[in-house]
């Protein structure tokens, strides 16, 4: 039924003899897989989380803007982002333009070619992702002083400083700062970034989450439990990169 709806929508668009038709939204390329121009609107997941917390956006395919942000995040992490990442990988080689939507009301657009050039350069040189800080019930006070954070926010618990799935990456085009999810770099150049041994084991996924945990003058830290690699593979968290798909 959904497939028939998509086919019907595509035929309706193709039957138009004049004018410009803009198809936009999550999964728009499903509706019009062979478009004249493909603009991919991208946003870092930390910004998505901030908009969840401000009750500004819903998860994919539902109207749950007023739901608890923690539940929206779980749905995003385990459902929305898994689906959208797989679809993104099939589109990256087809992008004409990339849209930076991280600052509300101030979008920036760059050609896919120049964005790819920036990612390629990053894969071969030192770089860091954009860190973000988050409070927690057991958090401490040390990072406030060391990182010059907001003194009014109680208990900073986390500094996420190398979590490509959720951090962002700044690319500089002249005087313009262009922000994209740093996971785009992992998807685009996984072998160059990770090396063959790591890529062979984990695919185009960054296998480690680096973060600083502050418990100074705070509470006890939670117990961390990490799965075996075999279990991760069973959950299909790893998959071929778009470039390897092109090679095959």
Question: Whereabouts are the PLM-identified features?
Answer:
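Glycine-rich loops and low-complexity Gly/Arg-rich segments
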Residues: 45-50, 62-67, 122-126, 235-236
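Single conserved hydrophobic/aromatic residue that forms the stacking wall/gate
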Residues: 2-8, 237-247
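Glycine-rich, anion-gripping cofactor-binding loops and their flanking helix/strand elements
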Residues: 9-16, 81
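Short C-terminal domain-edge/linker segments immediately following a structured domain
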Residues: 51-57, 67-76, 128-133, 189-193, ...
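Small-molecule kinase domains that catalyze NTP-dependent phosphoryl transfer to phosphate-bearing small molecules
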Residues: 28-29, 54-116
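Solvent-exposed alpha-helices and their adjacent loops that cap or buttress functional pockets
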Residues: 31-32, 91, 215-216
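Transition-metal
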Residues: 95-100, 104-239, 243
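ATP-dependent NMP and nucleoside kinases share a basic, alpha-helical "lid"
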Residues: 13-59
